[in-house]
């Protein structure tokens, strides 16, 4: 069973200047194993093992306009909740293949700040910083009992992101438009979730930290309503 919903509410505190946005995103996945072929091969009955995972991200964002609307700021706070429960079994050699009861939950706090400043009618600058998390998905934490092992000890992936960019956007007529955008970014990632190989199986594990930084740029020219030309380039480097 896979159940999910997303609720979003927006309220204008000051018309055309300040608004607050509240969002709640929830997902619950449960599964009951039933594989008679595998049970006969392993000479054990593992059918009926139930496990579930749920994750919820709640956020509140405050958007404000300053200096006659030339500067826009968005400040966001986030709460992450993660829960894992049920029975799992480790089928990898030399595991004992005995079902184990697992119940764990974690919560995290994140935030972000985004700024956009209109330099002129065609040019703008933007900046963003973010401290966020990525919660483990069902297949990452609980596997599939076929090719991917369970990984109930898996932690949420944590990232600190920084971005600085500039953008040009101009219409020359109703169908002709020129756009240019360039960004520089830094990403610091901790507890990265990687799919690794374990004795004939695969398993998701947290593998340390990484630093990723780079720049990218893109130019797009809409010649008319039927034709356009674009070019983009990216340079990046990662350090483990």
Stretches found by the model and what they are:
Residues 1-94, 107-108, 118, 128-130, ...:
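Face-selective signature of the C-terminal outer-membrane beta-barrel domain
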Residues 1, 6-8, 40-50, 92-102, ...:
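Extracellular loop and loop/strand-boundary signature of outer-membrane beta-barrel proteins
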Residues 1-2, 134, 224:
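Short acidic-glycine motifs
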Residues 116-118, 219:
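Membrane translocator/pore-forming domains, dominated by Gram-negative outer-membrane beta-barrels
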Residues 179-188, 205-240:
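Gram-negative outer-membrane beta-barrel transporters
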Residues 168-170, 223:
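Beta-strand C-termini and the immediately following turn/loop, strongest in propeller blades
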Residues 3-7, 54-60, 109-113, 125, ...:
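Hydrophobic, lipid-facing positions within transmembrane beta-strands of outer-membrane proteins
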Residues 28-39, 81-92, 103, 121-163, ...:
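Surface-exposed extracellular loop regions of Gram-negative outer-membrane beta-barrel proteins
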């Amino acid at each position: 069973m896979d159940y999910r919903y997303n609720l979003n509410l927006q309220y204008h505190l000051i018309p055309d200047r300040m608004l607050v946005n509240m969002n709640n995103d929830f997902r619950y996945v449960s599964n009951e194993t039933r594989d008679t072929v595998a049970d006969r091969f392993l000479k054990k009955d593992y059918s009926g093992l139930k496990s579930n995972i749920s994750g919820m991200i709640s956020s509140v964002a405050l958007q404000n306009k300053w200096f006659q609307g030339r500067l826009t700021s968005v400040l966001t706070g986030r709460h992450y909740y993660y829960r894992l429960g049920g029975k799992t079994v480790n089928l990898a050699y030399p595991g004992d293949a005995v079902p184990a009861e697992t119940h764990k939950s974690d919560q995290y706090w994140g935030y972000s700040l985004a700024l956009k400043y209109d330099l002129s009618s065609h040019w703008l600058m933007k900046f963003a910083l973010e401290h966020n998390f990525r919660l483990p998905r069902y297949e990452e934490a609980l596997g599939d009992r076929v090719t991917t092992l369970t990984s109930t000890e898996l932690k949420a992936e944590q990232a600190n992101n920084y971005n600085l960019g500039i953008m040009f956007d101009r219409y020359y007529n109703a169908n002709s438009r020129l756009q240019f955008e360039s960004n520089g970014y830094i990403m610091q990632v901790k507890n990265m979730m990687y799919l690794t190989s374990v004795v004939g199986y695969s398993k998701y594990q947290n593998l340390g930290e990484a630093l990723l930084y780079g720049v990218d740029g893109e130019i797009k020219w809409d010649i008319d309503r039927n034709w356009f030309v674009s070019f983009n380039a990216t340079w990046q480097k990662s350090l483990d």
